[in-house]
């Protein structure tokens, strides 16, 4: 196959990547500026260098305050304001940022939320219905994963199921039209331990939603599907994999023969999905543990085996993440980084050979690492947590109706987590009212050491973005805050 000819602006579109030809990028941008009459010809070179430096900066470090970027360029405020205006007139530079090493932050989270206006609402402390609502319907879990923050043995009383499921249906009814991905089922505890999950999924589908369930699939048996036919109305089932054999599963979950059962459940689900011609998507979340990067090849073989069982229906997606637990600086050692890069290259080659239609989501840090950048996971500490959190962006609701401000706080009996409950949904109090009351009364939580573990990656990104936007506004850059909008 002949490669397409590179356009004159291609160097600019790639300028944020490690090893990019920055000289060629500056030349291309300078030509664009001069040809379009955007700057005088004698200023095109200097202006282009500044613009390319901005693209490199925000393509790698998306949470940089504007004032910091201005100081880095060494220009005054008027000159910087002109540069920001010019940046928006060179689409190739925006492409460079969105496809750079930090592109997953921009495309997966920041820009979609900007376009919905939820950051504006959070900064203005305006009560709006959350952009994302996680329903945590599971009363218990059959695993005891060593990394899970769940208190051993903690569970919800089964007597809470009927009232809890009625409450969940009322929350689903509140979700505004226009955002079909606004709600998902997760935990907390295992969603499939709730015998009413299928009914809730069907109710969500009837409401115009496309919900995903995050599950370990241990209970995704044919009998469960027969008892809960509404599960077939889900948009997707995302199974968290805790290994690729029984030994690895037992080390992680504490349960014998768990992998074997999950694998057989998924094989049978593949067969049933094909027989029913169901549009439901099936995929995985897989964490690459230290020293196990080579297991990515076995992951592809595992998926290929499931494809064989699907009679033409193949696994739709896999989300790959690196284990950053215990890394306070959010960085990987150089040796481990090199090992992981090599493993990812081999993984992608095996995917092309055996599972060519598989969609792969590498998340934030691994996306950077794949480009050759020095991957560093964002870390929010108690000092930078926002007392007001961000209920306009996301909340989580457990079986009791408690509305949690962070995704990893929604576990029963978890020490300190109740401080992050904004309120409770009841027959007399809607989710809309809980959020409105929390925001309007100026609800705040003073973070203490360890509270950062109540936040997942999404919460951390949202917090970093809000801190950045607030800093930009305070520095007098309200009209350009956040760089890209």
UniProtKB/Swiss-Prot annotation:
Keywords: 4Fe-4S, Antibiotic biosynthesis, Iron, Iron-sulfur, Lyase, Metal-binding, Oxidoreductase, S-adenosyl-L-methionine. Its cofactor is [4Fe-4S] cluster. [4Fe-4S] cluster binds at residues 141, 145, 148. It catalyses: dTDP-4-amino-4,6-dideoxy-alpha-D-glucose + AH2 + S-adenosyl-L-methionine = dTDP-3-dehydro-4,6-dideoxy-alpha-D-glucose + 5'-deoxyadenosine + L-methionine + A + NH4(+) + H(+). Pfam families: Radical_SAM. Its EC number is 4.3.1.30, 1.1.99.-. Binds 1 [4Fe-4S] cluster. It comes from the Bacteria. Transmembrane segments: none annotated. CDD domains: Radical_SAM (cd01335). GO terms for biological process: macrolide biosynthetic process. The keyword Ribosomal protein does not apply. GO terms for molecular function: 4 iron, 4 sulfur cluster binding; ammonia-lyase activity; metal ion binding; oxidoreductase activity. Belongs to the radical SAM superfamily. DesII family. The reaction starts by the transfer of an electron from the [4Fe-4S] cluster to S-adenosyl-L-methionine, spliting it into methionine and the radical 5-deoxyadenosin-5'-yl, which attacks the sugar substrate. Monomer. Involved in the biosynthesis of dTDP-alpha-D-desosamine, a sugar found in several bacterial macrolide antibiotics. Catalyzes the SAM-dependent deamination of dTDP-4-amino-4,6-deoxyglucose (dTDP-viosamine) to yield dTDP-3-keto-4,6-deoxyglucose. It can also catalyze the oxidative dehydrogenation of the non-physiological substrate dTDP-D-quinovose to dTDP-3-keto-6-deoxy-d-glucose. It can also deaminate dTDP-3-amino-3,6-deoxyglucose. This is dTDP-4-amino-4,6-dideoxy-D-glucose ammonia-lyase. The gene is desII.
